[in-house]
Regions:
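Ankyrin-repeat intra-repeat helix-capping/turn positions
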Residues: 150-153, 191, 259, 292, ...
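Ankyrin repeat domain, specifically the short helix-to-loop turn at the C-terminus of the second helix
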Residues: 121-129, 159-172, 197-214, 230-238, ...
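N-terminal alpha-helical scaffolding segments that mark the starts
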Residues: 2-84
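Conserved ankyrin/ankyrin-like repeat signature
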Residues: 153, 157, 194-195, 262-263, ...
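Ankyrin-repeat boundary/"N-cap" motif
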Residues: 132-145, 172-183, 209-223, 234-251, ...
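Hydrophobic alpha-helical transmembrane segments corresponding to the first two to three helices
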Residues: 385, 391-587
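Alpha-helical protein-protein interaction/assembly modules
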Residues: 146, 300-303, 307-309, 313-316, ...
Length: 589
């Protein structure tokens, strides 16, 4: 995240030079133009013959099939949008062009698509009314310009245009910056419920998706790529959803994010689905969590939006609130989902569903990294601490008393025993031998035995049994750590065996935990407890000690033993965190 870049398309830059676009002579981006002047005179004189004639003669040449529209393959539209991207993101047909923005002709190899072909594959084609080559600088039509200026004069002109050419209503912006934005989107942004109703009555598509660069989260803009397989844009799934106008792509989501309840209800009444998901998998309720619209959230939920849909990051509205640390929204959704058993005054007895809250998946029994509790505990914002109240803290206390407390004390007792055994092992170790003595004996005993053993394994020499017995006698006699004559040595050897078995069991338990949690989550858990990391390292080193013992590498073993002791003892800090009086000191250390 944070992977953002500035991407101002050439069309946006060209809007300043409106004289190059024929469309702007009829209606320009400032609300002027030939048709605007005619419409003003028509409204004043109540004579519409002049404006009607101008629409028929001046607008119709800009349309496909005199306003009847034409089906365009989505693959051609994707190429038209893709030519505005940087060269390394261009699709293969455009990479060979020196200047794709000027050389690419969208009308080359256009097939004649019948109604039957469109009905068989509606996602493969888009019906357009306004000629692609006669559009504005950012792919807009005359209808977009009328609605964009948000005046009663231009609204009347827009209605007049739709009276003659009704199929213009579903034309969208074609440039990458605003791709997919329809007049319905613009009207919602203008907060004009009356015009929204008119457009819906005129047949506006209430499921049109607006996924232009301008409406994309900031940290996803650099990852935008195109594909011939579909019309929408591919983006990286990892995002923080921060965007100036990231409002969920659909008109219904636009209305919800902008708090336009009347527009929302109008669109919903026409059959719009509030559970439709945008490129990030977000529904209306996800978007309301992002923008913390509590009142609108209640309204959307009451009229049918679902709380159980997961987005691309596998987050429901509740878990999304937990991840983004939207404290008010989180507790609000929790209260919506709870089941109240009884209520007396300010006292309430309620049950909370745990399927999205608890770290244990209710279906698989595995750890859910996308649970609300896990997202809050591993959250990086200060606001995540505010979420550890009420239900979550009660859940943690219940889990502690039911499942963890006994195991924690048992682990503490077992580790204490392990540590005491390690003290016995390393306290009873004999001191170092006289300088030079051990090195001489090793060279005179181990070397020949090893060489003869290697030859024996190749079938060239048979080593007598008495020779091996002699090697063992030499090893036990010359290596101080293999001498079992005294009772202290026998106790030490027995304790070392116990310690080795204990280390093996600890390593095995860690491997089982990693298998259950998954490597990523296991490493995340270890990163929060450095003392446990040190202890596991000491266990691994303990498993290596027998090899050094058999080779009589006493100096190396002594060094390793010191490291083992130094990395074992700090594990007590983990268990000390149980007591509140020393917990702060433990965390500081």
């Amino acid at each position: 995240m944070g992977n953002t870049e500035s991407n101002v398309t050439s069309g946006v830059k060209k809007q300043a030079g409106t004289s190059e676009q024929k469309l702007y002579k009829l209606v320009d981006i400032k609300g002027g133009g030939l048709l605007v002047d005619m419409m003003k005179r028509a409204l004043q004189n109540k004579q519409y013959a002049e404006i009607d004639h101008a629409i028929k003669t001046k607008v119709e040449p800009f349309l496909y099939n005199k306003g009847k529209g034409r089906y365009i393959p989505v693959s051609h539209l994707v190429l038209l949008r893709n030519k505005e991207r940087s060269r390394h993101k261009l699709l293969p047909p455009l990479r060979g062009m020196e200047n794709p923005d000027e050389e690419f002709d969208v009308e080359i190899d256009w097939p004649q698509v019948t109604q039957e072909e469109y009905d068989a594959n509606p996602l493969g084609y888009r019906e357009l009314c306004w000629d692609l080559k006669e559009r504005g600088a950012v792919g807009e039509t005359i209808l977009h310009l009328c609605i964009l200026n948000a005046s009663s004069l231009l609204a009347n002109l827009a209605k007049r245009l739709l009276r003659f050419y009704p199929k213009m209503i579903n034309d969208v912006y074609m440039s990458d910056e605003y791709y997919g934005e329809s007049v319905l989107h613009i009207t919602i942004v203008n907060e004009d419920p009356t015009m929204v109703k008119f457009l819906l009555d005129a047949g506006a598509d209430y499921h049109e998706r607006c996924y232009g660069n301008f409406m994309c989260p900031e940290d996803q803009k650099a990852s935008r790529t195109d594909s011939f397989d579909h019309e929408w844009v591919n983006v990286q799934p990892d995002t923080n959803y921060n965007g100036y106008v990231y409002w969920g792509e659909y008109p219904l989501s636009f209305a919800a994010c902008l708090g336009q309840e009347e527009c929302y209800r109008l669109i919903l009444a026409r059959g719009a689905d509030p559970d439709k998901q945008d490129t990030n998998g977000n529904t209306v309720l996800h978007m309301l969590v992002i923008y913390e619209k509590v009142g609108t959230f209640d309204m959307a939920y009451e009229v049918g939006a679902s709380l159980n849909i997961r987005n691309v990051q596998n987050l429901t509205p509740l878990t999304l609130a937990a991840k983004l640390a939207r404290t008010e929204m989180f507790f609000h959704i929790v209260n919506i989902e709870r089941e109240i058993y009884w209520q007396i005054g300010a006292t309430t007895c309620a049950a909370y569903p745990l399927d999205q809250v608890d770290t244990i998946d209710t279906e698989t029994g595995l750890i859910s990294k996308d649970s609300a509790l896990n997202l809050v505990v591993f959250g990086e914002k200060d606001e995540h601490l505010d979420l550890l109240e009420g239900m979550l803290i009660d859940l943690l206390k219940t889990k502690w008393n039911t499942f963890v407390k006994f195991r924690f004390y048992r682990q503490f007792i077992l580790f204490t025993c392990y540590f005491l055994v390690s003290l016995v092992c390393f306290t009873l170790r004999p001191g170092p031998p006289e300088r030079g003595l051990n090195a001489t004996t090793i060279n005179s005993t181990m070397g020949p035995i090893v060489n003869e053993t290697e030859l024996a394994s190749e079938g060239e020499l048979e080593v007598p049994v008495n020779k091996m017995e002699g090697w063992w006698e030499d090893l036990t006699g010359e290596c101080r750590l293999m001498n079992f004559d005294s009772w202290q040595a026998k106790v030490r050897i027995f304790a070392e065996l116990l310690l080795w078995v204990g280390a093996l069991m600890y390593v095995g338990a860690a491997l089982r935990e990693a298998r259950f949690l998954g490597i990523k989550m296991f490493i995340e858990n270890l990163s929060t407890v450095p003392s446990r990391v040190m202890f596991l390292i000491s266990c691994l080193l303990m498993l290596v000690l027998p090899t050094l013992r058999l080779w009589c590498a006493e100096e190396e073993e002594d060094h390793l033993a010191v490291i083992i002791m130094l990395t074992t003892a700090p594990y007590f800090l983990f268990f000390c965190s149980l007591w509140k009086t020393i917990n702060c000191l433990t965390i500081t250390l």
